[in-house]
Protein backbone atom coordinates (compact mmCIF):
# COMPACT_ATOMS: atom_id res chain seq x y z
CA UNK A 1 0.00 0.00 0.00
CA UNK A 2 1.40 3.42 -0.92
CA UNK A 3 1.48 6.37 1.45
CA UNK A 4 -1.60 8.05 -0.03
CA UNK A 5 -3.59 4.84 0.26
CA UNK A 6 -2.50 4.38 3.87
CA UNK A 7 -3.50 7.94 4.76
CA UNK A 8 -6.89 7.46 3.12
CA UNK A 9 -7.54 4.35 5.20
CA UNK A 10 -6.51 6.18 8.37
CA UNK A 11 -8.80 9.10 7.52
CA UNK A 12 -11.76 6.82 6.89
CA UNK A 13 -11.12 4.90 10.11
CA UNK A 14 -10.89 8.12 12.10
CA UNK A 15 -14.12 9.44 10.58
CA UNK A 16 -15.98 6.24 11.40
CA UNK A 17 -14.84 6.43 15.02
CA UNK A 18 -15.76 10.10 15.32
CA UNK A 19 -19.21 9.67 13.75
CA UNK A 20 -20.48 7.00 16.12
CA UNK A 21 -23.25 7.15 18.70
CA UNK A 22 -23.16 9.11 21.94
CA UNK A 23 -25.45 9.35 24.97
CA UNK A 24 -28.85 10.80 24.14
CA UNK A 25 -28.38 13.69 26.57
CA UNK A 26 -25.00 14.69 25.14
CA UNK A 27 -26.13 15.51 21.59
CA UNK A 28 -25.84 19.26 21.04
CA UNK A 29 -28.49 20.61 18.66
CA UNK A 30 -27.98 23.08 15.83
CA UNK A 31 -29.01 26.66 16.48
CA UNK A 32 -31.75 27.78 14.10
CA UNK A 33 -29.93 29.62 11.30
CA UNK A 34 -31.16 32.78 9.67
CA UNK A 35 -33.32 31.86 6.71
CA UNK A 36 -31.81 32.98 3.40
CA UNK A 37 -33.88 31.13 0.79
CA UNK A 38 -37.58 31.06 -0.06
CA UNK A 39 -37.90 27.46 1.09
CA UNK A 40 -36.13 28.14 4.39
CA UNK A 41 -38.33 31.17 5.10
CA UNK A 42 -41.46 29.14 4.38
CA UNK A 43 -40.27 26.34 6.67
CA UNK A 44 -39.85 28.78 9.56
CA UNK A 45 -43.19 30.45 8.83
CA UNK A 46 -45.05 27.12 9.06
CA UNK A 47 -43.00 25.55 11.86
CA UNK A 48 -45.42 23.38 13.90
CA UNK A 49 -46.13 23.10 17.61
CA UNK A 50 -45.92 19.72 19.33
CA UNK A 51 -47.85 18.92 22.51
CA UNK A 52 -46.51 16.02 24.59
CA UNK A 53 -49.30 14.13 26.35
CA UNK A 54 -47.04 11.33 27.59
CA UNK A 55 -43.66 9.81 26.86
CA UNK A 56 -40.38 11.46 25.96
CA UNK A 57 -39.92 15.04 24.85
CA UNK A 58 -38.07 15.67 21.57
CA UNK A 59 -34.27 15.52 21.65
CA UNK A 60 -31.59 16.35 19.09
CA UNK A 61 -30.59 13.28 17.09
CA UNK A 62 -27.26 14.36 15.57
CA UNK A 63 -24.53 16.90 16.25
CA UNK A 64 -22.38 18.86 13.82
CA UNK A 65 -19.70 16.13 13.85
CA UNK A 66 -22.22 13.53 12.69
CA UNK A 67 -22.49 11.69 16.01
CA UNK A 68 -26.00 10.35 16.53
CA UNK A 69 -28.02 9.61 19.65
CA UNK A 70 -27.71 6.18 21.21
CA UNK A 71 -31.27 6.42 22.50
CA UNK A 72 -32.66 4.82 25.65
CA UNK A 73 -33.75 1.39 26.80
CA UNK A 74 -37.47 0.91 27.44
CA UNK A 75 -37.02 0.60 31.20
CA UNK A 76 -38.65 2.96 33.67
CA UNK A 77 -41.62 5.25 33.14
CA UNK A 78 -42.48 6.40 29.59
CA UNK A 79 -40.75 9.74 30.20
CA UNK A 80 -37.95 8.41 32.41
CA UNK A 81 -34.62 10.08 31.56
CA UNK A 82 -36.14 11.92 28.59
CA UNK A 83 -38.07 14.91 29.91
CA UNK A 84 -35.94 17.27 27.82
CA UNK A 85 -32.30 17.84 26.93
CA UNK A 86 -30.27 20.38 28.83
CA UNK A 87 -28.75 21.38 25.48
CA UNK A 88 -32.11 22.22 23.95
CA UNK A 89 -34.18 20.37 21.40
CA UNK A 90 -34.51 20.25 17.63
CA UNK A 91 -36.99 19.83 14.81
CA UNK A 92 -35.63 18.71 11.45
CA UNK A 93 -37.05 19.97 8.17
CA UNK A 94 -36.91 19.12 4.49
CA UNK A 95 -39.08 20.46 1.68
CA UNK A 96 -39.74 20.02 -2.02
CA UNK A 97 -42.39 20.14 -4.72
CA UNK A 98 -44.49 16.97 -4.86
CA UNK A 99 -47.36 16.48 -7.32
CA UNK A 100 -47.77 20.23 -7.70
CA UNK A 101 -47.91 20.94 -3.95
CA UNK A 102 -45.14 22.25 -1.71
CA UNK A 103 -44.39 19.70 1.00
CA UNK A 104 -42.58 20.63 4.21
CA UNK A 105 -41.68 17.68 6.41
CA UNK A 106 -40.99 18.40 10.08
CA UNK A 107 -39.44 15.56 12.08
CA UNK A 108 -38.81 15.01 15.79
CA UNK A 109 -36.55 12.45 17.44
CA UNK A 110 -37.35 10.76 20.77
CA UNK A 111 -34.79 8.58 22.63
CA UNK A 112 -37.36 5.82 23.22
CA UNK A 113 -40.94 4.91 22.41
CA UNK A 114 -42.25 3.14 25.49
CA UNK A 115 -45.94 3.06 26.53
CA UNK A 116 -44.80 1.48 29.83
CA UNK A 117 -41.66 -0.17 31.15
CA UNK A 118 -40.47 -2.99 28.93
CA UNK A 119 -42.84 -2.18 26.07
CA UNK A 120 -41.90 -0.39 22.87
CA UNK A 121 -38.42 0.15 21.49
CA UNK A 122 -35.28 2.28 21.62
CA UNK A 123 -35.51 5.42 19.41
CA UNK A 124 -38.58 6.99 17.87
CA UNK A 125 -39.03 9.32 14.91
CA UNK A 126 -42.34 11.06 14.25
CA UNK A 127 -43.14 13.73 11.70
CA UNK A 128 -45.82 15.83 10.11
CA UNK A 129 -45.94 16.88 6.47
CA UNK A 130 -47.45 20.33 5.97
CA UNK A 131 -48.71 20.85 2.42
CA UNK A 132 -48.97 24.41 1.12
CA UNK A 133 -49.83 25.88 -2.27
CA UNK A 134 -46.64 27.82 -3.01
CA UNK A 135 -43.83 29.10 -0.78
CA UNK A 136 -43.08 31.94 -3.21
CA UNK A 137 -46.26 33.96 -2.78
CA UNK A 138 -47.12 36.70 -0.31
CA UNK A 139 -49.53 34.58 1.73
CA UNK A 140 -49.05 30.82 1.26
CA UNK A 141 -52.03 28.67 2.24
CA UNK A 142 -51.99 25.47 4.27
CA UNK A 143 -53.78 22.89 2.13
CA UNK A 144 -53.32 19.80 4.31
CA UNK A 145 -51.38 18.19 7.13
CA UNK A 146 -50.31 14.55 7.40
CA UNK A 147 -49.12 13.52 10.90
CA UNK A 148 -47.30 10.19 11.17
CA UNK A 149 -48.94 7.31 13.00
CA UNK A 150 -47.62 3.74 13.33
CA UNK A 151 -45.81 3.50 9.96
CA UNK A 152 -48.71 5.32 8.28
CA UNK A 153 -50.42 8.70 8.37
CA UNK A 154 -53.59 10.50 9.31
CA UNK A 155 -54.83 12.98 6.71
CA UNK A 156 -56.38 16.40 7.21
CA UNK A 157 -57.11 18.31 4.01
CA UNK A 158 -57.44 20.94 5.24
CA UNK A 159 -56.74 20.78 8.99
CA UNK A 160 -59.47 22.19 11.23
CA UNK A 161 -59.12 25.81 12.30
CA UNK A 162 -58.63 24.89 15.97
CA UNK A 163 -55.59 22.74 15.06
CA UNK A 164 -53.78 25.68 13.48
CA UNK A 165 -52.41 28.62 15.44
CA UNK A 166 -51.67 31.37 12.95
CA UNK A 167 -49.48 29.52 10.43
CA UNK A 168 -48.43 26.76 12.84
CA UNK A 169 -50.20 23.39 12.82
CA UNK A 170 -50.60 21.78 16.24
CA UNK A 171 -49.81 18.10 16.73
CA UNK A 172 -50.05 15.85 19.76
CA UNK A 173 -47.60 13.08 20.73
CA UNK A 174 -49.34 10.35 22.69
CA UNK A 175 -49.49 6.64 23.39
CA UNK A 176 -52.81 4.92 24.02
CA UNK A 177 -51.55 1.97 26.09
CA UNK A 178 -50.36 -0.56 25.08
CA UNK A 179 -49.89 0.91 21.59
CA UNK A 180 -46.73 2.89 20.84
CA UNK A 181 -46.66 6.66 20.44
CA UNK A 182 -47.93 8.48 17.38
CA UNK A 183 -48.82 11.98 16.25
CA UNK A 184 -52.25 13.40 15.55
CA UNK A 185 -53.70 16.86 15.15
CA UNK A 186 -54.83 18.64 18.31
CA UNK A 187 -56.38 21.88 19.49
CA UNK A 188 -53.84 22.05 22.33
CA UNK A 189 -50.96 24.48 22.01
CA UNK A 190 -47.50 22.97 22.22
CA UNK A 191 -43.81 23.70 22.22
CA UNK A 192 -41.53 24.59 19.34
CA UNK A 193 -37.87 23.80 18.76
CA UNK A 194 -35.02 25.29 16.78
CA UNK A 195 -35.52 24.28 13.15
CA UNK A 196 -32.64 22.95 11.08
CA UNK A 197 -33.27 22.16 7.43
CA UNK A 198 -31.61 19.27 5.64
CA UNK A 199 -29.57 21.63 3.47
CA UNK A 200 -28.40 23.56 6.54
CA UNK A 201 -26.90 20.54 8.31
CA UNK A 202 -23.19 19.91 8.10
CA UNK A 203 -22.00 17.29 5.63
CA UNK A 204 -21.03 15.15 8.60
CA UNK A 205 -24.50 15.41 10.15
CA UNK A 206 -26.22 14.44 6.90
CA UNK A 207 -23.85 11.49 6.49
CA UNK A 208 -24.44 10.45 10.10
CA UNK A 209 -28.22 10.47 9.67
CA UNK A 210 -28.06 8.73 6.30
CA UNK A 211 -26.04 5.87 7.77
CA UNK A 212 -27.48 5.68 11.31
CA UNK A 213 -29.31 2.57 12.47
CA UNK A 214 -32.32 3.64 14.53
CA UNK A 215 -33.56 0.10 15.02
CA UNK A 216 -37.34 -0.21 14.71
CA UNK A 217 -37.73 3.33 13.40
CA UNK A 218 -36.03 5.59 10.86
CA UNK A 219 -35.39 9.24 10.06
CA UNK A 220 -37.98 9.98 7.35
CA UNK A 221 -36.17 12.94 5.80
CA UNK A 222 -32.91 11.22 4.82
CA UNK A 223 -31.96 10.64 1.20
CA UNK A 224 -33.19 7.04 1.19
CA UNK A 225 -36.51 7.77 2.91
CA UNK A 226 -37.73 11.26 2.01
CA UNK A 227 -39.53 10.76 -1.31
CA UNK A 228 -41.04 7.43 -0.24
CA UNK A 229 -42.41 9.05 2.92
CA UNK A 230 -43.96 11.90 0.93
CA UNK A 231 -45.73 9.39 -1.29
CA UNK A 232 -47.26 7.67 1.74
CA UNK A 233 -48.17 11.04 3.29
CA UNK A 234 -49.96 12.32 0.16
CA UNK A 235 -53.42 13.41 1.39
CA UNK A 236 -55.20 14.44 -1.81
UniProtKB/Swiss-Prot annotation:
Motif Hepta-peptide GHRHDWE motif II in this chain: 120-126
Keyword Lyase attributed: no
Q: Which InterPro entries match?
A: NPP1 (IPR008701)
Entry GO CC: extracellular region
Which cysteine pairs make disulfide bonds? none
What switches on its expression? Answer: Expression gradually increases to a maximum at 7 days after inoculation of pepper leaves.
List keywords of the entry alphabetically.
Answer: Secreted, Signal, Virulence
Is Metal-binding found in the keyword set?
no
Signal sequence, start to end: 1-19
Location in or out of the cell: Secreted
Motif Conserved undecapeptide motif I, chain ranges: 103-113
- The superkingdom listed in its UniProt entry is Eukaryota
Family recorded in the similarity comment: Belongs to the Necrosis inducing protein (NPP1) family.
Chain's role = Secreted effector that contributes to virulence during infection by P.capsici. Induces distinct chlorosis at 3 days after inoculation of host C.annuum leaves, and all the chlorotic areas gradually turn brown and become moderately necrotic at 7 days after inoculation. Leads only to chlorotic areas, without necrosis at 7 days after non-host N.benthamiana leaves infection. Induces cell death in hot pepper.
Please state what the annotation says regarding this protein's domains: Key residues/motif important for the effector activities are degenerated in most NLPs, including the nlp24 peptide consisting of the conserved region I (11-aa immunogenic part) and conserved region II (the heptapeptide GHRHDWE motif) that is important for phytotoxic activity.
This protein is called: NLP effector protein 3
Classification from the root reads: Eukaryota, Sar, Stramenopiles, Oomycota, Peronosporales
| Name of the gene encoding the protein in the UniProt record | NLP3
Amino acid sequence: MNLLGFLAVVALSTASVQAGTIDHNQVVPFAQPEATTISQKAAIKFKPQIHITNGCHPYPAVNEAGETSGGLKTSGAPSSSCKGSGWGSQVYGRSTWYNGKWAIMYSWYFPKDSPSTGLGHRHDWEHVVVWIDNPDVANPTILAASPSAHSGYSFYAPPSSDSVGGTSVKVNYESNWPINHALDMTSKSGETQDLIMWDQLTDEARAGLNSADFGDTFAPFTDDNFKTALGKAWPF
